[in-house]
């Protein structure tokens, strides 16, 4: 009996998609994997419009993105490119850009928008409801507020909350009742946007935690480091373009002080030395009595 062979044929659209992904991967110096799982279509379109001029975003199947990354790594002789695959999660997409990884992370973070929290979701931070009027008339909503632990009452014909109250701590799972209350109060504790999973540049894949920088804190540390280095350079007399002027000024001041103290007359010290001598003479004369000074002094 002859052996029957079956040939597996790859769908042409998959081949085209992989080739399209490869073009994207080769088009930018910086490639990012991002998570798009929780982004509603309306917000996604807004984000696309915001980032269109600075980066290219493409969604695809994880298996096809993985294949494209592996082929680009092989074709370019750059095996480190495959490190991106380790960052891949369900719902991932690719971004190609010329931005540096830190600026890319900041841009994507700033494109996020507030969103309501869903039942069963984890609170990203302490959720606090401030005291004051809800603007709603008396009705069933009063009981809903009390059911989630809010000190609510009727005030001036409207439902009001008596005091600031934290209804969920960071990490708490939000109940269905609380999610409804927060939605009615138009409180949006969530942020919807593109979350960075990993960014590749020059053989390095950056974890998002590395890219998350407090700019004010970083600037303060940079200024502190500069001041420390500047002082060290001046005190150790290590001339640099930034410190040479201060070093020369300090050396001149020290030399002048020594010259004055040693009564060594120069064009720079003569006035100070004579002034010092005069002051000393007057002090001695004062101790000796008024007759010690002639009329000219």
Swiss-Prot record:
CDD domains, alphabetized: Ribosomal_P0_L10e (cd05795)
Membrane-spanning parts: none
Gene Ontology CC terms: cytosolic large ribosomal subunit
GO MF assignments: large ribosomal subunit rRNA binding; structural constituent of ribosome
InterPro entries: Ribosomal_protein_uL10, Ribosomal_uL10, Ribosomal_uL10-like_insert, Ribosomal_uL10-like_insert_sf, Ribosomal_uL10-like_sf, Ribosomal_uL10_arc
Domain of life: Archaea
UniProt KW keywords: Ribonucleoprotein, Ribosomal protein, RNA-binding, rRNA-binding
Single Gene Ontology BP annotation: ribosomal large subunit assembly
Entry function: Forms part of the ribosomal stalk, playing a central role in the interaction of the ribosome with GTP-bound translation factors.
Listed PANTHER family: 60S ACIDIC RIBOSOMAL PROTEIN P0 (PTHR45699), LARGE RIBOSOMAL SUBUNIT PROTEIN UL10 (PTHR45699:SF3)
Similarity field: Belongs to the universal ribosomal protein uL10 family.
Complex and partners: Part of the 50S ribosomal subunit. Forms part of the ribosomal stalk which helps the ribosome interact with GTP-bound translation factors. Forms a heptameric L10(L12)2(L12)2(L12)2 complex, where L10 forms an elongated spine to which the L12 dimers bind in a sequential fashion.
NCBIfam families hit by this protein: PRK04019.1-2, PRK04019.1-5
Full protein name: Large ribosomal subunit protein uL10
Lineage of the organism: Archaea, Methanobacteriati, Methanobacteriota, Methanomada group, Methanococci
